[in-house]
Amino acid sequence: MSLSTEATAKIVSEFGRDANDTGSTDVQVALLTAQINHLQGHFAEHKKDHHSRRGLLRMVSQRRKLLDYLKRKDVARYTALIERLGLRR
């Protein structure tokens, strides 16, 4: 299930450089994180939905690749994004 338009716009405005910045790494990671969190609630109820679980694993992998890219290019932005999203403990 995808995020609503309002939720997407809110995330883009919060993490992007402007309201139309959907391509920056920060925004992409934040959107993937929101979708992953949404799907985790889905799997609490539908434990045998393996088709959607494959999509979840793709999203997690894509987020990992984007975070690795950001860590290589700009460590300060990487650590700030990790803190804002609460991804690492």
UniProtKB/Swiss-Prot annotation:
InterPro entries cross-referenced by the UniProt entry: Ribosomal_uS15, Ribosomal_uS15_bac-type, uS15_NS1_RNA-bd_sf
GO cellular component terms, A-Z: cytosolic small ribosomal subunit
Entry superkingdom: Bacteria
Keywords, comma-separated and alphabetical: Ribonucleoprotein, Ribosomal protein, RNA-binding, rRNA-binding
A single MF term (Gene Ontology): rRNA binding
Keyword Repressor in annotation: no
Family: Belongs to the universal ribosomal protein uS15 family.
Known function: One of the primary rRNA binding proteins, it binds directly to 16S rRNA where it helps nucleate assembly of the platform of the 30S subunit by binding and bridging several RNA helices of the 16S rRNA. Forms an intersubunit bridge (bridge B4) with the 23S rRNA of the 50S subunit in the ribosome.
Protein's recorded name: Small ribosomal subunit protein uS15
Lineage: Bacteria, Pseudomonadati, Pseudomonadota, Gammaproteobacteria, Enterobacterales
